[in-house]
Amino acid sequence: MAEQIIELEVYLVRHAESVGNVGYGGNAELSVADREDPVLTEKGLRQSELLGQRFKDCPLDCILSSGLRRTLSTVNEVVKAQPENGAKEIEILPSLAETGISHEYSGFTLEELKENYPVKLAEGIETDRMVVSSAGTDDYWNLERANQIWKYIRKRFHSGEKIIVAAHGNFNTSLFLRALNLPPQTGFDVAFTNTSVTKFVFFKKGTGRYGDDIKMLYHNETSHLAQEFPEVTFMT
């Protein structure tokens, strides 16, 4: 059997629990930012800390995130827990935004986000808009958006790097399907629990165990939550 050559390991992460996940308490006076870009709940903040602890002994080469606050707050805890040789900042990839974001919302500016997070725009990306809007689009549009993200990632990382790609429940489905080259009509729902981790390994072309180029090692893995939040883990 030929040697397996790993070019990239990707941890696909969903953000922690946000106010939008649990409801706004009947508040009808929400701003556009609060509606489209909700913050984490207290539970979500703790989930993020536990996610950070999961990666504390895993030095990452890069953390890519959407420009929405719930995702940035989640991976900020990962940055805090990284070892000395791990990732120390978050790179915003605006196209990782959740599906259905309205066109009237462009997100906070990079300078505004820098006040709360160690962020910069992802390498090679030039834009003033930290969030890609997709209201009114269909599954195929979002699948193509996901496809372009994978092309960007595979072109940039191919030397054995380990990276996090942090996004959202709905759009992570598009990323999952395109990574595995699956059609949108799969006949099953792809679940992504808050702070769940799905791991993909990309091999040098033709060197996978069966000649494949990609392997999914695990999906929707939440063992870091098991002790404090057993109700949201696969172990219940």
Predicted regions and their residues:
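Short glycine/proline- and acidic residue-enriched helix-loop micro-motifs
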Residues: 34, 115-141
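An N-terminal RHG(E/S)-centered segment typical of histidine phosphatases
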Residues: 1-61, 76, 80, 84, ...
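Phosphate-coordination/substrate-recognition cap region in phosphate-metabolizing enzymes
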Residues: 5-7, 49-126, 208
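Short beta-strand scaffold positions
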Residues: 65-66, 144, 166-167
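Generic beta-sheet signal
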Residues: 10, 161-170
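GST superfamily/GST-like fold recognition
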Residues: 168-173, 196
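Glycine-rich phosphate-binding loop signature in dinucleotide/nucleotide-binding domains
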Residues: 57-59, 153-161
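Acidic, low-complexity terminal tails and accessory targeting/binding regions
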Residues: 1-9, 98-119, 159-161, 177-236
